[in-house]
Amino acid sequence: MEKSFVMLKPDAVKRRLAGRIIARFEDRGLKIVAFKMLQIPEDLAMEHYQEHREKPFFRDLVDYITSAPVIAMVIEGKDCISLIRKMVGATNPAEADLGTIRGDFALETGRNIIHASDSPESAEREIKLFFDESEICSYEMPDREMIYEE
């Protein structure tokens, strides 16, 4: 099964949206296999967002993501990276469809609630940044055969 890294950003935590967002993933049959709340240190934030280092918004992004706790998760499921990206919606909430997480909850681009891996390579890199292998739990869902065709 494919794994994706998902992070609920400070605005999601401060606005008490975590439970509602997590329920959406579970309602779609996805499985949370790692979960933690943390205050991201600046060096980890800079490494996580390294692809934006030369962009003008980089410093604001680092300041924002380190301003309050986040919830980091590893979510597992069949083709979960593309499914989660569809569920998350467009980066700019004004362009995100209603029914997506950002379309329903996010208010502006700089405070857009959630981060999700955009590729298997990104997922692998991001998971390793936030979780040790021992923190990722494998388990069988009793309703698996109701969710996935074999």
UniProtKB/Swiss-Prot annotation:
<dbReference type="GO" id="GO:0006241">
    <property type="term" value="P:CTP biosynthetic process"/>
</dbReference>
<feature type="active site" description="Pros-phosphohistidine intermediate">
    <location>
        <position position="115"/>
    </location>
</feature>
<dbReference type="InterPro" id="IPR001564">
    <property type="entry name" value="Nucleoside_diP_kinase"/>
</dbReference>
<dbReference type="InterPro" id="IPR023005">
    <property type="entry name" value="Nucleoside_diP_kinase_AS"/>
</dbReference>
<dbReference type="GO" id="GO:0005524">
    <property type="term" value="F:ATP binding"/>
</dbReference>
<dbReference type="GO" id="GO:0004550">
    <property type="term" value="F:nucleoside diphosphate kinase activity"/>
</dbReference>
<keyword id="KW-0067">ATP-binding</keyword>
<dbReference type="GO" id="GO:0006228">
    <property type="term" value="P:UTP biosynthetic process"/>
</dbReference>
<feature type="binding site">
    <location>
        <position position="112"/>
    </location>
    <ligand>
        <name>ATP</name>
    </ligand>
</feature>
<feature type="binding site">
    <location>
        <position position="57"/>
    </location>
    <ligand>
        <name>ATP</name>
    </ligand>
</feature>
<feature type="binding site">
    <location>
        <position position="9"/>
    </location>
    <ligand>
        <name>ATP</name>
    </ligand>
</feature>
<keyword id="KW-0479">Metal-binding</keyword>
<comment type="similarity">
    <text>Belongs to the NDK family.</text>
</comment>
<dbReference type="Pfam" id="PF00334">
    <property type="entry name" value="NDK"/>
</dbReference>
<keyword id="KW-0597">Phosphoprotein</keyword>
<keyword id="KW-0808">Transferase</keyword>
<comment type="function">
    <text>Major role in the synthesis of nucleoside triphosphates other than ATP. The ATP gamma phosphate is transferred to the NDP beta phosphate via a ping-pong mechanism, using a phosphorylated active-site intermediate.</text>
</comment>
<keyword id="KW-0547">Nucleotide-binding</keyword>
<dbReference type="GO" id="GO:0046872">
    <property type="term" value="F:metal ion binding"/>
</dbReference>
<keyword id="KW-0963">Cytoplasm</keyword>
<keyword id="KW-0546">Nucleotide metabolism</keyword>
<protein>
    <recommendedName>
        <fullName>Nucleoside diphosphate kinase</fullName>
        <ecNumber>2.7.4.6</ecNumber>
    </recommendedName>
</protein>
<feature type="binding site">
    <location>
        <position position="102"/>
    </location>
    <ligand>
        <name>ATP</name>
    </ligand>
</feature>
<feature type="binding site">
    <location>
        <position position="85"/>
    </location>
    <ligand>
        <name>ATP</name>
    </ligand>
</feature>
<dbReference type="GO" id="GO:0005737">
    <property type="term" value="C:cytoplasm"/>
</dbReference>
<dbReference type="InterPro" id="IPR034907">
    <property type="entry name" value="NDK-like_dom"/>
</dbReference>
<dbReference type="GO" id="GO:0006183">
    <property type="term" value="P:GTP biosynthetic process"/>
</dbReference>
<feature type="binding site">
    <location>
        <position position="91"/>
    </location>
    <ligand>
        <name>ATP</name>
    </ligand>
</feature>
<dbReference type="InterPro" id="IPR036850">
    <property type="entry name" value="NDK-like_dom_sf"/>
</dbReference>
<keyword id="KW-0460">Magnesium</keyword>
<keyword id="KW-0418">Kinase</keyword>
